[in-house]
Amino acid sequence: MKKIITPLLACLLIAGCSSAPKTKTETASCSYTQEGLMTATYDLTAENNDITVLSLKMIYDKSMFGDIDFTTITEDMKGVTTKVEIEDTIIATIEMNLKEADPDTLKNLGFDFSNTDMSFDKVVQDMKDQGFDCK
């Protein structure tokens, strides 16, 4: 009996020590609409409650375009991808990989996350408190 239990316990010990901690991935999509002006949708992805990817999609009435400056957005920013579509509406999409993007680059785009609690739960709750519909 001892000969069976000892190898079994050794296997369990090895299996327990070699397992990596699980990464908890969460997502949320939060939208807000100002009738006749714009719709903003934030898509959030988090690992272990830390936001890793933040995507912002803004849809404006074409008449609002004069108030938006997209000249600072370029395609070569590490961790930031952008897309602007102009038809009957203006659709601007900015996706930021917060693990890769340079904080100064984000500041230049108007996204200053320094001294900000970027935990998934906090950001989603703050957005709900500001009137966003989060799913």
Q: What is the predicted role of each segment?
A:
Residues 1-4, 8:
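Positively charged n-region of N-terminal signal peptides that target proteins for export
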Residues 8-9, 19-22:
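Hydrophobic membrane-targeting and insertion signals
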Residues 14-16:
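C-terminal motif of bacterial Sec signal peptides marking the signal peptidase cleavage site
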Residues 21-135:
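Subset-of-secretome marker
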